[in-house]
């Protein structure tokens, strides 16, 4: 007899779950037995397709539209999850915004736009969920290679992701005993998603730079796949990861190892 799925009947929230890494995470959690609520900003059709994939796996799927500028968004997400599943066992803060801006061109509007998605949403979503957490909850934040690499024109994005890693460590300490929760972070490098797509408007120097970096990737000379990241996130949501908290897991093939 096969063992039961490792996340059987767990209730998960995956922000930004309509495409790319978020979609892969949502489907992998469902494959391991979880019911999954995914959020999206504008890609409603893609979100519905992900929900259908989750349902094909025999799990419940819920879709919630939530803009990063909507201050009531976190509460609506949590209430939808509790209404459908009764509790929250897993939160994956995957929704993010990556955009470049030189310091000389920085505006308050640009700063707020990045920070709203990459910091405000995760913080207030977790806050709203605290009183509804299950008996052994898991929180996984999605960071970025940019948090540590010092790439040109990424100071705001890098700062937001470095701060998310810092919040991960602080939450692990602050919430661990009180809620029996583990809090970890996953740090992807380049991943083969539509966000990474190259077209005629992409700077040739940028393309050449990343092509060279990919060839240097220690694990293999390729970019990551959404599935590569989803496998790591799913493990951090399982009981077997119980002794791992406050960690930032490098999921970038070794491009950055600190």
From Swiss-Prot:
Record: active site: 143 (proton donor), 144 (proton donor), 157 (proton acceptor), 161 (lowers pka of active site tyr)
Disulphide connectivity of cysteines: none
InterPro entries: NAD(P)-bd_dom_sf, Sc_DH/Rdtase_CS, SDR_fam
EC numbers: 1.1.1.-
Pfam family name, one: adh_short_C2
Annotated GO MF terms: oxidoreductase activity
Catalysed transformations (reactions): (1S,3S,6S,7S,8R)-7-hydroxy-6-[(4-methoxyphenyl)methyl]-3-(methylamino)-5-azatricyclo[6.3.1.0(1,5)]dodecan-9-one + NADPH + H(+) = (1S,3S,6S,7S,8S,9S)-6-[(4-methoxyphenyl)methyl]-3-(methylamino)-5-azatricyclo[6.3.1.0(1,5)]dodecane-7,9-diol + NADP(+)
Coiled coil region boundaries: none
Alphabetized SUPFAM superfamilies for the sequence: NAD(P)-binding Rossmann-fold domains
Known pathway: Secondary metabolite biosynthesis
Positions contributing to NADP(+) binding: 21, 41, 94, 157, 161, 191, 193
Keywords assigned: NADP, Oxidoreductase
Keyword Oxidoreductase: yes
Broad EC category: oxidoreductase
Recorded family membership: Belongs to the short-chain dehydrogenases/reductases (SDR) family.
PANTHER family: OXIDOREDUCTASE, SHORT-CHAIN DEHYDROGENASE/REDUCTASE FAMILY (AFU_ORTHOLOGUE AFUA_5G02870) (PTHR43639), SHORT-CHAIN DEHYDROGENASE_REDUCTASE FAMILY PROTEIN (PTHR43639:SF1)
Protein name in UniProt: Short-chain dehydrogenase/reductase FrzI
Taxonomic lineage: Eukaryota, Fungi, Dikarya, Ascomycota, Pezizomycotina
Gene name per UniProt: FrzI
């Amino acid at each position: 007899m096969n063992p039961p799925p490792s996340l059987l009947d767990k209730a998960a929230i995956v922000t930004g779950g309509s495409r790319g890494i978020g979609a892969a995470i949502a489907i992998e959690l469902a494959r391991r037995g979880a019911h999954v609520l995914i959020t999206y900003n504008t890609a409603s059709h893609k979100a519905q397709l992900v929900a259908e994939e989750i349902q094909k796996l025999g799990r419940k799927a819920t879709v919630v539209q939530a803009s990063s500028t909507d201050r009531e968004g976190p509460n609506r997400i949590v209430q939808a999850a509790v209404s459908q599943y009764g509790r929250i066992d897993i939160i994956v803060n995957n929704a993010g915004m990556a955009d470049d801006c030189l310091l000389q061109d920085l505006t308050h509007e640009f700063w707020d736009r990045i920070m709203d998605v990459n910091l405000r949403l995760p913080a207030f979503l977790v806050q709203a969920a605290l009183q509804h957490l299950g008996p052994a909850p898991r929180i996984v934040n999605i960071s970025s290679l940019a948090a540590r690499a010092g790439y040109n024109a990424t100071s705001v994005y890098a700062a937001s992701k470095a701060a998310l890693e810092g919040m991960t460590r602080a939450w692990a300490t602050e919430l661990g005993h009180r809620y029996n929760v583990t809090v970890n972070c996953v740090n992807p490098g380049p991943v083969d998603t539509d966000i990474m797509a190259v077209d005629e408007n992409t700077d040739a120097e940028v393309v050449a730079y990343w092509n060279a970096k990919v060839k240097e990737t220690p694990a293999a000379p390729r970019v990551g796949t959404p599935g590569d990241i989803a496998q790591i996130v799913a493990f951090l949501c399982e009981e077997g990861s119980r002794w791992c908290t406050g960690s930032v897991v490098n999921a970038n093939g070794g491009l950055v190892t600190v």
